[in-house]
Amino acid sequence: MDKKEYSETFYHPYKPYDIQVQLMETVYRVLSEGKKIAILESPTGTGKTLSLICATMTWLRMNKADIFTRMETNIKTNEDDSENLSDDEPDWVIDTYRKSVLQEKVDLLNDYEKHLNEINTTSCKQLKTMCDLDKEHGRYKSVDPLRKKRKGARHLDVSLEEQDFIPRPYESDSENNDTSKSTRGGRISDKDYKLSELNSQIITLLDKIDGKVSRDPNNGDRFDVTNQNPVKIYYASRTYSQLGQFTSQLRLPSFPSSFRDKVPDEKVKYLPLASKKQLCINPKVMKWKTLEAINDACADLRHSKEGCIFYQNTNEWRHCPDTLALRDMIFSEIQDIEDLVPLGKSLGICPYYASREALPIAEVVTLPYQYLLSESTRSSLQINLENSIVIIDEAHNLIETINSIYSSQISLEDLKNCHKGIVTYFNKFKSRLNPGNRVNLLKLNSLLMTLIQFIVKNFKKIGQEIDPNDMFTGSNIDTLNIHKLLRYIKVSKIAYKIDTYNQALKEEESSKNENPIKETHKKSVSSQPLLFKVSQFLYCLTNLTSEGQFFFEKNYSIKYMLLEPSKPFESILNQAKCVVLAGGTMEPMSEFLSNLLPEVPSEDITTLSCNHVIPKENLQTYITNQPELEFTFEKRMSPSLVNNHLFQFFVDLSKAVPKKGGIVAFFPSYQYLAHVIQCWKQNDRFATLNNVRKIFYEAKDGDDILSGYSDSVAEGRGSLLLAIVGGKLSEGINFQDDLCRAVVMVGLPFPNIFSGELIVKRKHLAAKIMKSGGTEEEASRATKEFMENICMKAVNQSVGRAIRHANDYANIYLLDVRYNRPNFRKKLSRWVQDSINSEHTTHQVISSTRKFFSMRSLNSR
């Protein structure tokens, strides 16, 4: 199949919509032309994920096919070097040798695909038997060094004993030594081993099948060298549930082999990367409740004398039959994250480390944002983006995510609680701690007291910038001490021991008092432990850059915030072949260009904003021109606006929309919604509206109302959901079909300009404009647009909840006269802009609404 046919079909499993073809062609063209960035907006419900898969996998397989063809051509034209043959050999001998080498590598590729097919037809219970058979065929030569050890390890004591809370002896001045050896019984750390193990870059597929990589005679895997894919597709998203949706979509299409008839059946080598919290199978580690504690407990166990029964940091473990069997089982079919845990348990092999070992073979890798966006995490996991395709989905949150990864915040209350926790821990275990641990805990406590005193003495207003050197003025704390304390926290794993000990005390006290910990407290248990927050904050203190700023935030907090997200993103851009930023609501795209890609030439950036797959008659967007409906900061509390105009609009709309269809309205803040509800309740308007439609409203600390609203809609009683922009219901929840036949945006949801974060960001942006030669007017314009972009991104994200598939229908109501202004209107998503109705007065809007739903009712008969 030639390139034209590839680009026309993309092996989509269904007949694609026009916008899906448009998106696939754009992605394929970007990759073929070597463009660096693609920013793609495709509304939710338009098959965006499947289109991205089809386009990128088609290009990937075509690219590998081109490499294979060039390799065959090089053999025919004698362009390769047959270093194992003498220059005096006849040409026909050299040619025959080259062909035989190529054929040998192709045979190995074919053998591996057949091997994966064998696994795919074998149940998990038969897997060990199959491994033994494979050994007879010479695929696995090593003896499983762990089997005997695992047999006697079925019953593990996972209860928390006092010994679990005590760190290993720590030498206070050992920072100049190899800490992995001095504190871990001579074992080498994973990071040190990994960095030396896979340091060479893989450029083309020919490098992998040319036979030049020396083979370890103790390596029992005959496929280890031949199946490493130099160009990969890395797909990152915000949550594991979103990554799971990608997995289900990847199962739908089928792609041809890169090697044509030479290797007729080439499976998609898919690898889902996840954290130890998702993949760990050791009960001694999983008894801890937070990700940070699990990571530290894992490291503690692996480097202990006892070790982990499911993993060893040795070549022997990497090439033992069960480890290789788990790796191959991962690639035998498209496995989800949840599939890896039972597979690992059935073989007694750690799925987390086995999946890391499988990375070189993978074609497609899914990973959470943190794994991709944090350079240190990529390094520790040996994620090499060189010449690969990086897809970042749900990218409307990308800038905020980068900022949060490289930022840190600690409050006065956090510091006091951490101080109290250390004192409690120290008083309990001081007689059982060696001098190194005691000294460092006292130093850490002294540092906390210094920070507490600094906040109490210096906090004056939110947004007040802080010189980090001022935090320790007049104290005996200096940067060197902080570096040593950070080393201590990292090596000793003291953070999870202190935090979990104090949590155990709370649970024990609660049990004695027969007063179970409230649900809200249980939720906090899984949040980040305090001492980890402290260590992150200290890390920011010791790694100062000009791109960040310390300042005071609300609740007597000190925050470090990254101000230039483009800096850490540069490393991804520099390594990857192409970065695709995709999402359902990517407007305004100017935000990405100015904040994330300022140094990328415009000719290297491709943008696409797709329309929706629904027929045009299935969506209407209304913007009122009534001056009374203006929710500015000065006017929004007006009794006339709230009790008359806003209330009457909801009453009229509730009557115009059929009762079987729900209405979802988004308010700019919890405070404003609470004000509206209070006003309506004071004069019985709330009861009046509630008689027309059952009202459900979101409260900041309230219970989940979605299930009640959904049940009410299902019963056809007429329901109205009042939600918050940026709240629990504005993102990630699909209000499809009758759950939302009308979505209302009340006002323009500008962020709080008095928050410390926005004060510092706006000041930084204005200073940057002035520094580059701009005027005060230009700086003012830039900060104004910055605020507008935040606002309109939130609008697009909220109204995008309404339409979820091709047959869905709904109306959008933008309830503020300011939406008529070009600067706001042009920042709406394209599919929303294209659906704007010319009706402007509320009377006209309601009349048009009745006609809209009347037509839907007639068409459904």
UniProtKB/Swiss-Prot annotation:
Catalytic reaction list: Couples ATP hydrolysis with the unwinding of duplex DNA at the replication fork by translocating in the 5'-3' direction. This creates two antiparallel DNA single strands (ssDNA). The leading ssDNA polymer is the template for DNA polymerase III holoenzyme which synthesizes a continuous strand; ATP + H2O = ADP + phosphate + H(+)
Location of region: Disordered: 161-188
Phosphoserine found at: S86, S172
MF (Gene Ontology): ATP binding; ATP hydrolysis activity; DNA binding; DNA helicase activity; iron-sulfur cluster binding; metal ion binding
SUPFAM superfamilies linked to this entry: P-loop containing nucleoside triphosphate hydrolases
GO BP, sorted A to Z: establishment of sister chromatid cohesion; interstrand cross-link repair; mitotic G1 DNA damage checkpoint signaling; mitotic sister chromatid cohesion
Annotated ATP binding sites: S42, P43, T44, G45, T46, G47, K48, T49
InterPro entries per UniProt: ATP-dep_Helicase_C, DinG/Rad3-like, DNA/RNA_helicase_DEAH_CS, Helic_SF1/SF2_ATP-bd_DinG/Rad3, Helicase-like_DEXD_c2, P-loop_NTPase, RAD3-like_helicase_DEAD, Rad3/Chl1-like
Gene3D superfamilies on file: P-loop containing nucleotide triphosphate hydrolases
Keywords: ATP-binding, Cell cycle, DNA-binding, Helicase, Hydrolase, Iron, Iron-sulfur, Isomerase, Metal-binding, Nucleotide-binding, Nucleus, Phosphoprotein
Chain positions of motif DEAH box: 393-396
Secreted among keywords: no
Coiled coil location: none
Record localization: Nucleus
The protein's role, per its UniProt record: ATP-dependent DNA helicase important for chromosome transmission and normal cell cycle progression in G(2)/M. May have a role in changing DNA topology to allow the loading of proteins involved in maintaining sister chromatid cohesion in the vicinity of the centromeres. Has a specific role in chromosome segregation during meiosis II.
Family: Belongs to the DEAD box helicase family. DEAH subfamily. DDX11/CHL1 sub-subfamily.
Subunit structure: Interacts with ECO1.
Name by which UniProt lists this protein: ATP-dependent DNA helicase CHL1
Record gene name: CHL1
